[in-house]
């Protein structure tokens, strides 16, 4: 039988700036409209909140954690009758995993792409050609100055 990891819960509370997830009464409203759950039934925001309540650190931010399957759609935020905001808990867990260096390597790759190019996926010749065929304007990246300001404020990321 696993024991509640109070130390991990305290870390999560600090990351969240509170403990709103303690108000979850496991109604499942967050799961009902979750696109990630629809395509991957193992992903379950309700279970993530339950594991957070128990402080199951390894299952939440260890290798193979399900939190990375969240699409950040905010449907759970809209549906929760208790204002638990499961997405905020999931984002906090992702931040903790990055700091603990347990995030999948692809996460750092995407962050590096955003820092260097301002996008998560580089524009390929195929994309350029398709945009032209669809009469879409050339893709211009003119936000790097703003992005660099944002990244300079938060040096942890």
Locations of the language-model features?
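Ferredoxin-type iron-sulfur electron-transfer modules in oxidoreductases and energy-metabolism complexes
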Residues: 2-16, 39-67, 86-119
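Short flanking/linker segments adjacent to small metal-binding domains or redox-active Cys/His motifs
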Residues: 77-90, 94, 113-157
């Amino acid at each position: 039988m696993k024991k509640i990891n109070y130390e991990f819960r305290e870390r999560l509370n600090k990351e969240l700036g509170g403990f709103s997830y303690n108000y979850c009464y496991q109604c499942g409203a967050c799961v009902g409209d979750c696109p990630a759950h629809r395509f991957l039934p193992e992903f379950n925001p309700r279970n993530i909140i339950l594991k957070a309540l128990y402080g199951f650190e390894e299952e939440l931010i260890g290798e193979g954690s399900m939190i990375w399957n969240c699409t950040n759609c905010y449907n759970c935020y809209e549906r929760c009758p208790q204002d638990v905001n499961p997405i905020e808990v999931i984002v906090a867990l992702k931040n903790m995993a990055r700091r603990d260096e347990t995030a999948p390597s692809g996460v750092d790759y995407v962050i590096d792409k955003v820092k260097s190019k301002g996008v998560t996926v580089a524009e390929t010749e195929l994309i350029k050609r398709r945009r032209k065929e669809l009469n879409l304007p050339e893709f211009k990246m003119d936000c790097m100055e703003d992005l660099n300001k944002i990244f300079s404020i938060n040096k942890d990321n």
